Design a protein with these regions (language model features):
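Conserved catalytic-core segment of nucleotide-activated headgroup transferases in glycan assembly
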Residues: 172-213, 217
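Active-site and donor-binding regions of nucleotide-sugar-utilizing enzymes
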Residues: 4-123, 256-258
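Nucleotide-sugar donor-binding/catalytic module of glycosyltransferases
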Residues: 295-516
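Catalytic binding pocket for nucleotide-activated donors in carbohydrate/polymer assembly enzymes
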Residues: 256-294
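Short loop/turn segments at strand-loop or loop-helix junctions that form parts
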Residues: 31-32, 80-83, 98-109, 175-184, ...
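Short, charged/polar "capping" segments at the starts of alpha-helices
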Residues: 13-14, 34-42, 86-87, 108-109, ...
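Donor nucleotide-activated moiety binding/catalytic core segment of transferases
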Residues: 59-65, 215-263, 283
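A nucleotide-sugar donor-handling region in carbohydrate enzymes
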Residues: 101-182
Length: 527
C-alpha cells in the first residue's frame, strides 16, 4: 500500500493522474487547509482512486490514522507539499520511499518556497527541505520543466479535465472571470491586507466580472459576485465554456492561468504587482499578457539630476518607466551636460510623465533644488542618472509611507551586484531601522542611499533644501537637518541597483569614495 498526501483540489487532480500512471494501491490523506467547501468535496474525490481515505480536519486524526493503518505495510509516500509538517509526521524515510508530484506554480516559477531556504527543518529528526528533495525517487509532473527537481527525476503525466460530454457554447456570449490568490505570505496579516487591496482594485478595473475565490486562502472583497462552486477552476472552466462561447480569465500568477490558456475560447491575462514582477515575467514567456496594477495611488514627483551620463541615463529612465506604480512625473534636471545626455533624454519626452530641464552647470545640490521647485506632488523620490530601480521600488516604499503618517522620509537597500536583484522582491521584516536608533546612527554614518529615498516635499522645504556648499555629501547634510527621532525609516529590502560607470574613472573613484563613506564620521568626509 502507498500513501498519497494532498492539501488542495489541484493536488487531488494531479494525484489522480499519478494513480493512473502507476496502477498501484493508495491510501489517500487530505489535510483541510480552509473552510472552503471544495476542501471536503475534493477529499471525497480521492475515494475514486484510493482504496481508503482520511480527511484531516481536527486534532484526533493521529489515533484514527494509526487504527486505519495498523496492519498495513506502507511502501511509498507520495507528496506535493514538500514542507508540510503534518505530512512529515507521517512519512518515515526509514521504511518508506518518497515520491513527489506537482504543487501548482512552484513547478515552473522560481524562486519559490521550495527553492529558497532549503536548509530549513521541515519535519522530525531534523529533516531539511533539501533532504526531502534529495529523497524523492521521482517527481510526477504535468509540466515540461521543473524548478525544484532535476530532469532525471521528472516523470511526465497527462492532465486533462475536459468532461467526455463537453460541448462548447456557440452563442457569442463573453464573460470575464478573476481567479483569487494570496500574494506574499498567506499567514501574514499585512500581506493579506495587501492581497485584498490589490484584488479589489483588479476587480474594480475589470468591471462586470465573476470572482472565483482561492480554495485554501480567504480573501475579503466587496461589491463583486463571488461564485460559489464545488469545482476547482481547472474543471470549472468547462462549465463556463458550456454557457459562454468566450471566457476571459484574469489573475495574478495562479497555476490555473497556465492550465487553461490553450483551451479554445479562453484568453488569459495577468496583473503585474510589486509583489509579482518576477512571476509575471515568467508568464510572459508562456505567452500570457500582463497589465500593471499599482498598490498605491499616491502622486509622486521623481527628481533625477544628470551630468554627462549619456551611457547610463537611458537605463535609469527605463527603470522609472518600468515601475508597477504609475502615478508619477519624472523631472530630469540636466546640469549643463557636455556629452550626448540631452539627446538621450529627449527621446523619452513622448511620454507626458517625463519632463526635461537643462540648466547652466551649477552642481548637484543646485540641480536638486531646481527639481524640488518644479515638484508639485506631496511626495518626492530621488533617482540617480546611473542607478536603476527595480520595478517594485516605488510601490513598495510608498505603501510603507502611507501606512505610517508620521514618516517624512523612507529609504531602502541597494546593491552593486545585479544578480542579487533578480527573482523579484525579497522583503525582510528584520533589521529595519527607524526611530531613535536610526536618528543616532545618522550622526556617524550616512544610512540612506540617495537613489532609494522618498520624502515629503514639505519636510525638505522646512529643512531648507540641499545646501550647494556640501556637494558630494549633500544628502547626508540634508538628513542631518531633516531627520528626527520618529519621522524616518530605512527598510532592509533591496530595491535598486547601484551603478558604478566604468567609463568615467574620476566618477568611479568618487562614487566608491561615497560608498565607503557610509562607515565614516561626517568630520572625516569633510576633510
Amino acid at each position: 500500500m502507498n500513501i498519497v498526501f494532498c492539501t488542495s483540489p489541484f493536488q487531488v487532480l494531479v494525484a489522480r493522474e499519478v494513480a493512473k500512471a502507476t496502477g498501484e494501491k493508495f491510501f489517500g490523506i487530505y489535510l483541510k487547509m480552509s473552510n472552503d467547501n471544495r476542501q471536503k468535496i475534493y477529499a471525497d474525490k480521492m475515494k475514486g482512486f484510493c482504496e481508503d481515505t482520511l480527511f484531516i480536519d481536527d486534532i484526533e486524526w493521529h489515533s484514527e490514522l494509526r487504527e486505519r493503518l495498523a496492519n498495513v505495510k506502507i511502501d511509498k509516500f507520495y507528496l506535493a507539499s514538500l514542507d508540510n509538517p503534518i505530512a512529515h509526521s507521517i512519512f518515515n524515510p526509514s521504511f518508506m520511499r518518497l515520491f513527489t508530484f506537482d504543487d501548482g506554480s512552484t513547478s515552473i516559477i522560481a524562486p519559490n518556497m521550495y527553492t529558497r531556504y532549503t536548509d530549513r527543518v521541515v519535519g522530525p529528526n531534523e529533516i531539511t527541505l533539501e533532504k526531502v528533495i534529495n529523497l524523492s525517487q521521482g517527481h510526477y509532473t504535468i509540466f515540461d520543466t521543473n524548478t525544484v527537481f532535476s530532469t532525471e527525476k521528472l516523470i511526465k503525466i497527462p492532465f486533462d479535465t475536459k468532461p467526455n460530454n463537453f460541448a462548447r457554447a456557440t452563442n457569442g456570449k463573453r464573460v470575464k472571470v478573476f481567479i483569487g490568490q494570496a500574494l506574499g505570505n498567506y499567514i501574514d496579516k499585512k500581506d493579506i491586507k495587501i492581497t485584498e487591496k490589490l484584488t479589489q482594485k483588479a476587480l474594480e478595473r475589470l468591471g462586470d466580472v465573476l470572482y472565483y475565490a482561492h480554495p485554501r486562502v480567504s480573501v475579503n472583497v466587496e461589491n463583486v459576485e463571488t461564485v460559489q462552486v464545488d469545482k476547482c477552476f481547472e474543471e470549472e472552466i468547462y462549465d463556463l465554456l458550456s454557457n459562454y462561447e468566450n471566457v476571459e480569465v484574469y489573475g495574478f500568477y495562479s497555476t490555473s492561468l497556465f492550465l487553461v490558456k490553450d483551451i479554445p475560447g479562453v484568453s488569459v491575462h495577468c496583473f503585474r504587482t510589486f509583489l509579482t514582477t518576477n512571476e509575471v515575467e515568467i508568464l510572459r514567456n508562456y505567452g500570457i499578457e500582463s497589465m500593471d496594477l499599482p498598490l498605491s495611488d499616491a502622486e509622486v514627483d521623481i527628481i533625477m539630476p544628470v551630468y554627462n551620463r549619456e551611457k547610463t541615463v537611458a537605463n535609469a529612465i527605463e527603470s522609472v518607466l518600468n515601475q508597477t506604480h504609475k502615478n508619477f512625473r519624472l523631472i530630469i534636471v540636466d546640469d549643463g551636460s557636455l556629452d550626448g545626455t540631452e539627446e538621450v533624454c529627449r527621446k523619452y519626452l513622448n511620454d507626458e510623465r517625463v519632463v526635461y530641464h537643462k540648466v547652466l552647470h551649477g552642481g548637484i545640490s543646485r540641480a536638486l533644488n531646481i527639481g524640488i521647485s518644479l515638484a508639485t506632488a506631496k511626495y518626492i523620490a530621488r533617482q540617480e542618472s546611473d542607478d536603476e530601480w527595480m520595478p517594485w521600488h516605488l510601490d513598495f516604499l510608498l505603501n510603507e509611507l502611507e501606512l505610517n503618517d508620521k514618516l517624512d522620509i523612507i529609504g531602502s537597500k541597494v546593491d552593486t551586484d545585479k544578480d542579487k536583484l533578480q527573482g523579484g522582491i525579497k522583503r525582510s521584516n528584520f533589521n529595519n531601522l527607524s526611530g531613535e536608533e536610526l536618528w543616532f546612527q545618522l550622526a556617524y554614518k550616512n544610512m540612506f542611499n540617495h537613489s532609494t529615498v522618498i520624502y515629503r516635499k514639505s519636510a525638505v522645504m522646512e529643512a531648507g533644501g540641499y545646501d550647494p556648499e556640501y556637494d558630494g555629501f549633500e544628502d547626508w547634510h540634508l538628513w542631518a537637518r531633516m531627520v528626527t527621532k520618529d519621522n524616518a525609516m530605512l527598510v532592509n529590502t533591496l530595491t535598486a541597483y547601484y551603478g558604478l560607470p566604468e567609463e568615467d574613472n574620476r566618477g568611479m573613484i568618487f562614487r566608491r569614495r561615497l560608498a565607503k563613506s557610509r562607515g565614516l564620521r561626517l568630520e572625516d568626509v569633510l576633510e
